[in-house]
Design a protein with these regions (language model features):
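Acidic/aromatic-lined carbohydrate-recognition and catalytic surfaces
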Residues: 1-159
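Surface-exposed loop/turn positions
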Residues: 150, 384, 403-405
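Loop/helix patches that line or flank the sugar-binding groove of alpha-linked glycan CAZymes
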Residues: 3-5, 203, 211-214, 220-229, ...
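Short catalytic/ligand-binding loop motif for oxyanion handling, primarily in non-cytosolic enzymes
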Residues: 17-19, 53-54, 90-92, 124-127, ...
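Beta-strand-rich binding/interaction modules
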Residues: 372-390
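Active-site-proximal helices and loops of the catalytic beta/alpha 8
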Residues: 69-81, 117-218, 271-286, 356
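C-terminal beta-strand-rich structural cap/linker in extracellular carbohydrate-active enzymes
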Residues: 395-412
Length: 412
């Protein structure tokens, strides 16, 4: 499968599901919930690091090598490929480091893993950009190129844009894609000091829109490819704010699924659970169904109104919208490899852009603020509404959007 067409679901193993009642999630917990990931529509499972030492051994709190083998096999039987994230502190400073890392990566690829995720921040922090590219070229030569369908991604928040592009240019033979979400963009969908009114007030929304358009357009022009995700962290919502949570989740999903890049869903994004590294909330029972023991990780206290079981039963839920969005992306080639072109580019509140290839042209419109907003769609008069966050609405050259409202139109 074309790696651009995949939908990646990233699991933090420690906080996903606990099967041995020790209060921490484990590899067997991911295997137990693999059908949930399949139901969502993701076809790629990215695991947080589960290794100890140099990458051959499994951390005993996470499980065993046999457990990981069983998970890889079970995922494959559901047509889900498994990508293993290497430890962030894996040294890649010299030839001997790279040889040891290469051996560990080949070991797991030979055992059935589909791909490898490498932390690129440590090498970036050294200040020697050449070291980063030398290391990735060496890993490509020693490992990635030996496995024709190997899915490779760089993980890191500190890689400069130009380096992220260079890492993923095909002719450079380094990585397939780089997770690239600058810190200010990652935080853009997060409330400031718990105030929903500050979510996208003033400059934050404008900056997010400007930078998102820039990275999309320039990434395409320069031949880069990104793993496209928004970290919805630190959001605290009461049951009275349920509608806001749901709409905000849908707006973020719509951007991730229709932008240029391979979409990344971090566990919990699909139900609007934004607290990073807290237990996944499966139901509203004790410990949110995460464990029969005592959780060692702190929950976010919203299990009564944010949990998987509840979201899966409602057609208007964030989970249902994620399912529809993943399916839509998979069925429209323009959303996978099409050109990205901004529309109404000076609008500070609305993301609007087209995705076009030789087969079709789609228009995406998203209000990224908590206030009503207008968007000018001059020249766009006819289109079929394929996806909507609230309710369907015909396309018009001037549209008023409700908070976090969004649409995808197939243009005629």
């Amino acid at each position: 499968m074309d790696p651009r067409a995949r939908a990646v679901y990233r699991v933090d193993v420690r906080s996903f599901f606990d099967t041995d009642a020790d209060g921490l999630g484990d590899i067997n917990g991911v295997a137990a919930k693999i059908d949930y990931i399949k139901e969502l529509g993701a076809d790629t499972l990215m695991l947080s690091p589960v290794f100890s030492g140099e990458g051959f051994m499994i951390d005993t709190e996470a499980g065993t090598a046999d457990d990981l083998d069983a998970l890889i096999d079970k995922a494959a039987s559901r047509m889900i490929g498994t990508v293993l994230e290497m430890r962030a502190d894996m040294p890649l400073n010299d030839a001997s480091d790279i040889d040891r890392a290469s051996a560990a990566m080949r070991y797991w690829l030979d055992r059935g893993a589909m791909g490898i995720a490498v932390n690129t921040d440590a090498l970036t922090a050294s200040g020697d950009k050449r070291a980063l590219h030398r290391a990735m070229c060496a890993l490509n030569r020693n490992v990635f190129s030996l496995y024709p369908d190997c899915f490779t991604v760089g993980i890191g928040k500190n890689v400069p844009f130009e380096d992220a592009v260079q890492l993923t240019r095909t002719e450079n033979r380094e990585l397939l894609m780089q997770l690239y979400t600058p810190a200010h963009m990652a935080e853009a969908f997060s409330p400031a000091s718990g105030s929903l009114g500050a979510l996208f007030g003033g400059g934050d929304a404008k900056r997010f829109k400007h930078d998102a358009d820039y990275y999309q357009v320039q990434g395409e022009l320069k031949g880069g490819w990104f793993l496209n995700g928004i970290s919805l962290t630190q959001g605290q919502f009461s049951s009275q704010q349920e509608l806001t949570r749901r709409l905000r989740s849908k707006a973020a999903c719509l951007y991730v699924m229709t932008g240029r890049g391979t979409p990344l869903i971090r566990q919990g994004d699909e139900i609007g659970l934004y607290a990073e590294n807290t237990p996944m909330q499966w139901n509203n029972s004790r410990a949110a169904g995460f464990t029969l023991g005592t959780p060692r990780l702190k929950g976010d206290g919203s299990l009564s109104h944010i949990n998987v079981e509840d979201d899966m039963t409602h057609m208007d839920s964030a989970f249902s919208f994620y399912k529809r969005s993943i399916a839509l992306r998979r069925s429209h080639s323009a959303l996978i490899g099409g050109e990205y072109a901004p529309v109404d580019s000076e609008n500070p509140r609305v993301m609007a852009y087209t995705r076009s290839d030789g087969a079709e042209s789609l228009l995406v419109v998203i209000n990224i603020t908590d206030r009503a907003a207008k968007v000018a769609l001059t020249g766009y008069k006819k289109g079929e509404c394929l996806l909507f966050t609230n309710s369907p609405k015909p396309i018009a050259e001037s549209m008023k959007l409700q908070p976090y409202e969004g649409f995808v139109y197939r243009l005629r």
